[in-house]
């Protein structure tokens, strides 16, 4: 039995919801990278990435526990146990990519690094087309929008790469560009497990819980190797204890953006959801240029090139994202879901309910374990918060408050619509 058809009105609702989730993801993913500016305070980029991943780990277990409960996470993975391996693999790819972004920010700054690693959208589009039938039967208008958008993104990335080289040393520019592009390739490939999970009926909140095991495990291994052993790593963590709170918070903020991104991928696909969430490049430019003054001291032509490059990439992202799937293309998604169901012997109702944004199982009450997770995460933030000191960074507070306010408004709006339409399914 194949997954049944979804009513056209329901499809349109879920696709509008996916677009909203992608926009909110961009805002929160952009804000989460701001604490990475701390690398200029003398912290190792690997240490920064490790502590952020610790915050990610806390967020990936506590937010699903509060929203649905870990019992429903367990129920989902009993339906599709093969996705545990895919989730952990995706987490490993993310950990390496995130570490590369810290190096890129250190060498290039937020304003330049963001658009470069957002070439992950091009990789994501390729995998979506090759493996999951995205854009098949989409028509020439949608194909033109997606391919034209990809060309715009690539051109904008080239402009930003060129302008970056004139304001940092040659070696730093080369290393930063390589790190940013490497992160883009890894993140683009990471979306294969995402799409497999959601075509199989998996709830995004369940998938990210096991995803983070791969993240933390891989990041711990990378940190111990790069820094020089567990004892050296522990010593550096103690020396940076006054900054741990901010980096944990950055990881937690990143989780919020990533969860929105997961819902975007689920409801509008990799080839559209990832480019839309990559609007974080604009947030990165706003935070870097306006809140931190990264472009201060640059010449007029250099600033103009940075802005033109970002706008060009944003135009490409908009072209791709506005090319919403039509009925014939959506049918290809259903066929891809059927292939996943047959390949792994999944329950047809579980897959069908997932495609419709519904739960195949009744809601369950929160357990004592759920509240223990929330309490442990809260304790970690309180403990590190007592030792925290404000980083010695120049910050335009008016801009920071305005950007934060917009992000909070997007968060509230998206959560309300997600709850009303899907009950977080």
Where are these regions (language model features)?
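Polytopic alpha-helical membrane proteins, predominantly small-molecule transporters/carriers
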Residues: 1-425
């Amino acid at each position: 039995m194949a997954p049944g058809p979804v009513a056209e009105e329901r499809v349109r609702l879920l696709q509008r919801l996916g677009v909203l989730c992608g926009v909110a993801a961009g805002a929160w993913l952009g804000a989460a990278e701001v604490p990475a500016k701390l690398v200029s305070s003398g912290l190792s980029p690997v240490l920064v990435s490790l502590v952020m991943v610790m915050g990610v780990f806390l967020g990936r277990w506590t937010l699903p526990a509060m929203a649905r409960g870990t019992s429903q996470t367990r129920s989902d993975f009993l339906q599709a146990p093969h996705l545990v391996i895919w989730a952990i693999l995706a987490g490993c790819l993310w950990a390496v990519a995130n570490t590369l972004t810290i190096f890129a920010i250190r060498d290039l700054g937020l304003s330049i690094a963001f658009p470069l690693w957002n070439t992950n959208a091009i990789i994501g589009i390729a995998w979506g087309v090759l493996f999951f039938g995205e854009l098949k039967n989409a028509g020439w208008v949608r194909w033109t929008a997606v391919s034209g958008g990809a060309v715009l993104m690539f051109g904008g990335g080239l402009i930003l790469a060129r302008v970056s080289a004139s304001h940092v040393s040659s070696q730093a520019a080369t290393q930063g560009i390589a790190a940013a592009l490497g992160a883009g390739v890894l993140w683009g490939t990471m979306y294969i497990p995402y799409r497999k999970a959601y075509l199989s009926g998996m709830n995004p909140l369940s998938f990210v819980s096991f995803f983070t095991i791969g993240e933390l495990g891989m990041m711990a291994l990378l940190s111990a190797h790069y820094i020089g052993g567990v004892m050296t790593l522990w010593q550096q963590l103690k020396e940076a204890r006054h900054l741990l709170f901010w980096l944990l918070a950055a990881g937690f903020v990143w989780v919020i953006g990533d969860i929105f991104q997961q819902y975007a991928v689920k409801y509008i696909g990799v080839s559209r959801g990832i480019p839309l969430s990559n609007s974080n490049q604009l947030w990165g430019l706003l935070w870097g240029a306006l809140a931190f003054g990264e472009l201060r001291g640059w010449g007029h032509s250099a600033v103009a090139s940075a802005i033109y490059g970002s706008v060009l990439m944003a135009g490409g992202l908009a072209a791709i994202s506005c090319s919403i799937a039509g009925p014939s293309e959506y049918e290809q998604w259903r066929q891809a879901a059927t292939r996943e169901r047959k390949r792994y012997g999944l329950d047809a109702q579980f897959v069908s309910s997932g495609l419709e944004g519904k739960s195949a199982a009744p809601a369950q009450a929160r357990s004592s374990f759920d509240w223990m997770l929330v309490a442990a995460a809260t304790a970690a933030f309180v403990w590190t918060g007592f030792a925290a000191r404000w980083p010695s960074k120049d910050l335009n507070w008016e801009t920071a408050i305005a950007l934060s306010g917009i992000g909070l408004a997007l968060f509230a709006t998206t959560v309300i619509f997600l709850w009303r339409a899907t009950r977080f399914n």
